[in-house]
Swiss-Prot record:
One of its GO terms (cellular component) is endoplasmic reticulum membrane. The keyword Transmembrane helix applies. Keywords: Endoplasmic reticulum, Membrane, Signal, Transmembrane, Transmembrane helix. It is found in: Endoplasmic reticulum membrane. Residues 407-428 are cytoplasmic. This is Uncharacterized endoplasmic reticulum membrane protein C1709.03. It is a single-pass membrane protein. Residues 20-385 are lumenal. It comes from the Eukaryota. Residues 1-19 form the signal peptide. The lineage of its organism: Eukaryota, Fungi, Dikarya, Ascomycota, Taphrinomycotina. The chain crosses the membrane at residues 386-406.
């Protein structure tokens, strides 16, 4: 990831922050397959939300999940709603993860409740820093590469993490963005924007980038092969318009509707999505930039030391030389077990996984078995064995039934049934 991107995040965050200060309202998070109860949407801290997002992106081994964390219940619900068994038989699809600044909860997905809310919502600049941390962790896990396919000069970015694909950047000009916007939403709405104004140009370019992203995700969804790419985006154009023109301005109202339209399109073509809606910043806050910078740095807490099993193992490469090394390398067995000595071997510590019990909407308990070196994978061996042998036995019974019917059909009928002689009744 380039230094230019970090510099743009910093400058963009400063620009928006100086205009409005710090916001402490709640952010709303929408996730595919997970919807909160209308009257009981859970609210968690920014630090707990970091753990949930890390699980969603597959980098939870970098983040320590405490036993009494507010994130644990939500993660268990995610595990219950997305069956590992179904993903075993069906191809994985791309994961879309977007943060949208300047959009409130009630303005999106009327029929869908947020999965959860984030209390004391950090700024968009803090979320941008968090996304960068996730991207570094993704790259270190699979030696993949995160490519910035779109980048503007106030912190907006769209990236794709993929270990195999090569992606070109989305480039446009102010005139091209305005022309494309007019084709999408009409001439009347396009006439409200002035490409000589920086905030207008940024928003139009983000709309153009989202349109290209919709086309990209649509083509991906039609492919039958597995797709493990992850799209991570940070959109700040709407927030910039809010700061420039105000929440009651016509241009902001139109831009908000445009953003909701494109997010709904992404929702339709993306099988797995996460939308983080950051509400418009409250301009009444008077905190200084120095205070805000400190808040941004501490907003999501600290993850564990960024290593991926780089601690020393013993000579056979299967055990860790100490309990501490095992605990650090596996993030305390991903919170699903504990490190203990293996047999009678000296300097050999491995994870002993334990089961988790989650409840579904009907109040029924479900046991989740964990496996793997760091207890980070669900053990579906029992379900697989049941499905496998059920299929084999069922297929065998089907063949046996067909053969039995075929053999019966080849036998000659008895003489009584095949006789054509007419029975004549005698009279006396």
């Amino acid at each position: 990831m380039s230094l230019l991107r970090y510099f743009i995040f910093f400058i963009g965050g400063c620009t928006l922050a100086l205009a409005s200060g710090v916001s402490y309202t709640e952010a709303s998070v929408y996730m595919s397959g997970l919807s909160g109860n209308e009257n009981e949407v859970p609210s968690i801290s920014p630090s707990d939300s970091r753990l949930v997002f890390a699980h969603k992106l597959g980098v939870s081994r970098f983040h320590k999940l405490k036993s009494h964390s507010g994130a644990r219940k939500i993660i268990n619900e995610m595990l219950h709603s997305h069956s590992e068994l179904s993903s075993f038989f069906y191809a994985e699809k791309s994961n879309t993860f977007l943060t949208i600044a300047g959009l409130a909860e009630s303005e999106l997905f009327d029929t869908l409740n947020p999965a959860f809310r984030i209390s004391s919502c950090p700024s968009s600049n803090a979320f941008a820093s968090l996304m960068c941390r996730y991207e570094r962790q993704l790259d270190s896990l699979d030696n993949g590469k995160t490519t910035d396919i779109y980048l503007n000069d106030i912190g907006g970015v769209i990236s794709i993490h993929d270990s195999t694909g090569v992606y070109s950047q989305i480039t446009t000009t102010p005139y091209k963005s305005l022309e494309d916007y007019e084709q999408l939403f009409g001439e009347d709405k396009a006439s409200m924007f002035d490409i000589s104004v920086k905030q207008d140009r940024v928003f139009l370019s983000e709309i153009y980038a989202l349109k290209i992203l919709v086309e990209f995700l649509s083509s991906k969804s039609q492919q039958e092969r597995s797709d493990t790419s992850i799209v991570i985006g940070q959109l700040v154009g709407l927030e910039a318009l809010y700061e420039k023109y105000g929440k009651d301005s016509k241009i902001y109202q139109v831009a908000r509707e445009n953003m909701m339209t494109l997010l709904s399109m992404i929702k339709q073509v993306s099988s797995t999505y996460t939308f983080i809606l950051l509400p418009p910043i409250d301009s009444s806050e008077t905190s200084t930039r120095y205070h805000k910078r400190q808040v941004d740095m501490e907003a999501f807490g600290e993850e564990i030391e960024e290593v991926v099993a780089s601690y020393e193992k013993n000579y056979n490469g299967r055990c860790y030389i100490s309990e501490e090394a095992c605990s650090k390398a596996t993030n305390d067995c991903s919170g699903h077990g504990r490190c203990s000595k293996y047999g009678q071997l000296d300097s050999c510590y491995v994870c002993q996984c334990s089961n988790s019990v989650v409840s579904n909407a009907a109040g029924q308990n479900k046991t989740i078995r964990w496996a793997g070196e760091s207890c980070s994978k669900q053990d579906i061996s029992v379900e697989f064995q049941f499905f496998f042998w059920f299929t084999i036995i069922g297929f065998g019974l089907l063949i046996f039934s067909i053969m039995l019917l075929f053999s019966i059909g080849q036998e000659e009928l008895a003489n009584v049934l095949t006789s054509t002689a007419t029975v004549i009744k005698k009279t006396t």
